[in-house]
């Protein structure tokens, strides 16, 4: 282990419109090449489309619910024992849960064919809110993989 002190976590300020730290982290994940104003524009217009489509009064609550539906509870980690590598199911930490859900939503929005990012992101958020779509499938696959390797759960760290 390193003898240096542990790195301090950067405190992220809340976003200016909704006052949410979670939304600001989401904007930071959407951002590419340091262009935050473009990322903000994309996320805010996607949230507007999302709220109109689902008919929610509180956009932030609907966004958090969509994010909650995408969060994985379990994942598998490789663990080498003897000469064999086992896929050991472990519980996902709270911070990593958020991070994975955001990453999956954004990647699936980017991979939507022939759509601009705003439309793709809004569509993916709607799908997550309704518990369907590629992000939810990814979450279910992760859970299925953990369930299939439940026999190796005793190899925990």
From Swiss-Prot:
GO annotations of cellular component type: small ribosomal subunit
Functional note: One of the primary rRNA binding proteins, it binds directly to 16S rRNA where it nucleates assembly of the head domain of the 30S subunit. Is located at the subunit interface close to the decoding center, probably blocks exit of the E-site tRNA.
One Pfam family named in its UniProt record: Ribosomal_S7
Family to which this protein belongs: Belongs to the universal ribosomal protein uS7 family.
Assembly behavior: Part of the 30S ribosomal subunit. Contacts proteins S9 and S11.
Superkingdom of origin organism: Bacteria
InterPro entries: Ribosomal_uS7, Ribosomal_uS7_bac/org-type, Ribosomal_uS7_CS, Ribosomal_uS7_dom, Ribosomal_uS7_dom_sf
Organism encoding this protein: Chlamydia caviae (strain ATCC VR-813 / DSM 19441 / 03DC25 / GPIC) (Chlamydophila caviae)
Ribonucleoprotein is among the record's keywords: yes
GO biological process: translation
Protein name (database record): Small ribosomal subunit protein uS7
MF-aspect GO terms: rRNA binding; structural constituent of ribosome; tRNA binding
Keyword Translocase: no
Alphabetically ordered keywords of this record: Ribonucleoprotein, Ribosomal protein, RNA-binding, rRNA-binding, tRNA-binding
């Amino acid at each position: 282990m390193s003898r240096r002190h542990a790195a301090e976590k950067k405190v992220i300020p809340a976003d200016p419109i909704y006052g949410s730290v979670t939304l600001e982290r989401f904007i930071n994940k959407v951002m590419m090449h340091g262009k935050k104003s473009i990322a903000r524009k994309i996320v805010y217009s996607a949230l507007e489309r999302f709220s109109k489509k689902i008919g929610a009064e509180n956009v932030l609550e609907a966004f958090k619910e969509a994010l909650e539906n995408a969060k994985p509870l379990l994942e598998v980690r490789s663990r080498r024992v003897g000469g064999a590598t086992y896929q050991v199911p472990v519980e996902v930490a709270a911070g990593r849960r958020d991070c994975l859900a955001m990453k999956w939503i954004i990647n699936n929005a980017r991979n939507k064919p022939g759509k601009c990012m705003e439309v793709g992101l809004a569509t993916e958020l709607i799908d997550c809110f309704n518990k369907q779509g590629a992000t939810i499938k990814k979450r279910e696959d992760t859970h299925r993989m953990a369930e299939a390797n439940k026999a190796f759960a005793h190899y925990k760290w």
